[in-house]
Swiss-Prot record:
Transmembrane segments: 1-21, 135-155, 193-213, 472-492
Alphabetized UniProt keyword annotations: Cell membrane, Membrane, Transmembrane, Transmembrane helix
Record's protein name: Uncharacterized protein Rv3403c
InterPro entries documented for this protein: FAD/NAD-bd_sf, HpyO/CreE_NAD-binding, L-asp_N-monooxygenase_NS-form
Pfam families, per the entry: NAD_binding_9
Matching PANTHER family: BLR0577 PROTEIN
Entry superkingdom: Bacteria
Bilayer topology: Multi-pass membrane protein
GO CC term (a single one): plasma membrane
Keyword Lipid metabolism belongs to the record: no
Cellular location(s): Cell membrane
């Protein structure tokens, strides 16, 4: 694996066959699939030059599985659902063979959250029963990194590919003279631009949507992105902010959003002794006012009357399907049934309904209603979800259904925030002052995106938002324009013959897409026959 340790003074930028922008799981999985195909091909193939541009110091993991997440952060899916074969088997073997090493590290560095997780899962750990475990996410990052290091070495030994890592932020993209030119802001003495025949955009989701009107630092503690610079450092900021508040009545934390990131923040606060000792209250506000439901693996009896009635019709419209799902789940919730454990049943009925929809209505559901369906049945594992239950049980945590209108600094100049929100058609000011505000409210839409790279690529006609405005429009070969490809969350919201997803974040889904992208890239780069990915 090569890097650029020297100052690039040449006018002509270094040129590559392929440039990956972003080095997270989507990039790693695509490169691993490419490596498998190249290494198993019986035919010699021209050596590829591949660049991987990453703004953070850690390559191959991305935010969820890397150092920007807390060591204690857990996967939201148990291992049986987290990965598909053959990757699942390889991961199991790795977990078992390296258990002594990673478990000792986790115990030493993971604090109270790690100690609780190890205690709660001791029997499964001792018996190497991995399938039902919600594993620490960093483990998958280490697993991916070790696979990448081995693949890079093998490709180099066979003279099949040279993978060059470049520590820089991609700032711009345009096409010229049959190549794409990527402008870079290097960290250190790296190149300020590269050229590539093909580009793979693997930068994850758009930036977090800010909730403060001003860019200036407020007097209160404001965390706009829980993973920037990292989960551990932001928990430390919360700890310090509460330490500075003398009055116990004012040691309050506001969390905006009730998604998986919000749940993770609550989990880490619950297991931080200093935060627990000092915090008076934690308020979570979101439109639903509901956290992801706890998976208990105890499916309740429920017949889904609206959905079953709809399935008796000849043809189904997307809006009618969404309405039936919403009504049935509302009925189930009124009966105090656990929606997490109804997921498999409603997913099966959804599959039946899909077969009764024409392509126009299928696309309508995927692009208009899909994310709303996902929000209705968001789920989380016991370990992570139980922490918020415990915070609620002791009176620390309260959930509020409403839309945040603004968060302002206190007029008195004291280091506290006030929150104004809309609920039940009226505007309210929350009575509690907040020492800290954590923004977990989701990502920017692409038409108002602040990412310089995405803005440049869209302005230069290389890509455009799809119907959801959360992903980029691509064809069956993952191309937003010829040779300008997209992988990862930005593929969500596409409806093509081969790519039909409204949400692309789970590891198995990304891996399946990476397999297809790798095959497409190699087919376009290599004139020789390659083993299928």
């Amino acid at each position: 694996m090569l890097a650029f340790p020297y100052l690039m003074t040449m006018i002509t930028p270094p040129t590559f066959d392929v440039a990956f922008i972003g080095s997270g799981a989507a990039c790693s999985m695509t490169l691993l699939e490419m490596a498998d195909a190249l290494l198993s091909s019986p035919s010699a193939s021209p050596k590829l030059r591949i660049a991987v541009v990453e703004r953070d110091e850690q390559f191959w993991c991305g935010i969820p599985y890397g150092q920007r997440s807390s060591i204690g952060s857990l996967a939201i899916q148990k291992l049986d659902d987290f990965a598909d074969e053959p990757e699942k088997a390889a991961y199991r073997i790795w977990l078992e063979q390296n258990k002594q090493r990673w478990l000792a590290f986790f115990q030493a560095e993971g604090g109270a959250a790690a100690a609780r997780w190890i205690c709660d899962n001791r029997d499964a750990l001792d018996g190497n029963q991995w399938g039902e475990l919600y594993l620490p996410r960093f483990l998958f990052g280490v697993f991916l990194s070790e696979q990448m290091i081995a693949a890079i070495a093998a490709l180099g030994e066979r003279d099949l590919a040279e993978i060059v890592t470049i520590r820089a932020e991609a700032m711009s993209a345009h096409s010229a003279d049959g190549h794409y030119r990527i402008g870079l802001r290097p960290s250190g003495n790296g190149p300020t631009a590269i050229a590539a025949g093909k580009v793979v955009v693997a930068i994850g989701s758009p930036p977090t949507k800010a909730i403060l009107a001003s860019d200036s630092e407020p007097a209160f503690t404001y965390i706009n992105d829980f993973y920037s610079p990292g989960g551990e450092s932001n928990v430390a900021r919360l700890r310090d902010s509460l330490d500075r508040v003398e009055s116990w009545e004012k040691r309050n934390v506001l969390v905006v959003g009730s998604n998986a990131t919000s749940l993770e923040a609550l989990y880490l606060m619950r297991h931080d002794a200093r935060i627990r000792a000092r915090v008076r209250s934690i308020t979570v506000i979101s439109r639903s006012g509901v956290l992801p439901y706890m998976i208990c693996n105890q499916p309740p009896e429920f017949d889904f009357p609206r959905l079953r009635t709809l399935l008796c019709t000849e043809a189904i419209a997307a809006a009618d399907l969404m309405s039936a799902i919403r009504d049935d789940l509302a009925t189930a919730e009124e009966r105090s049934l656990n929606l997490a454990d109804l997921y498999d049943a409603v997913a099966a009925l959804f599959g039946q309904a899909l077969h009764k929809m024409d392509l126009v209505q299928q696309e309508e559901f995927f692009c208009v209603h899909g994310m709303n369906f996902t929000k209705l049945v968001r789920r989380a594992g016991r370990d992570c979800r139980q922490a918020s239950e415990e915070l609620a049980a002791d009176g620390t945590l309260s959930l509020l259904a409403g839309e945040v209108l603004r968060v302002d600094a206190c007029a008195s100049g004291q280091p506290f925030a006030t929150m104004t929100y809309r609920a039940a058609g009226a505007e309210h000011t929350h009575p509690v002052p907040f020492a800290a505000v954590v923004n977990c409210g989701g990502f920017e839409e692409l038409d108002t995106c602040s990412s310089p790279f995405l803005v440049s690529a869209m302005q230069n006609g290389l890509c455009r938002p799809n119907r959801t405005n959360r992903g980029l429009l691509v064809n069956d070969d993952f191309e937003a324009s010829p040779g300008f490809c997209v992988i990862g969350p930005l593929v969500g919201g596409n409806f093509t013959p081969k790519i039909r997803f409204w949400h692309v974040e789970s590891a198995p889904r990304v891996r399946s897409l990476a397999k297809s992208l790798a095959a497409s890239l190699l087919a376009s780069l290599q004139p020789v026959a390659l083993a299928p990915c």
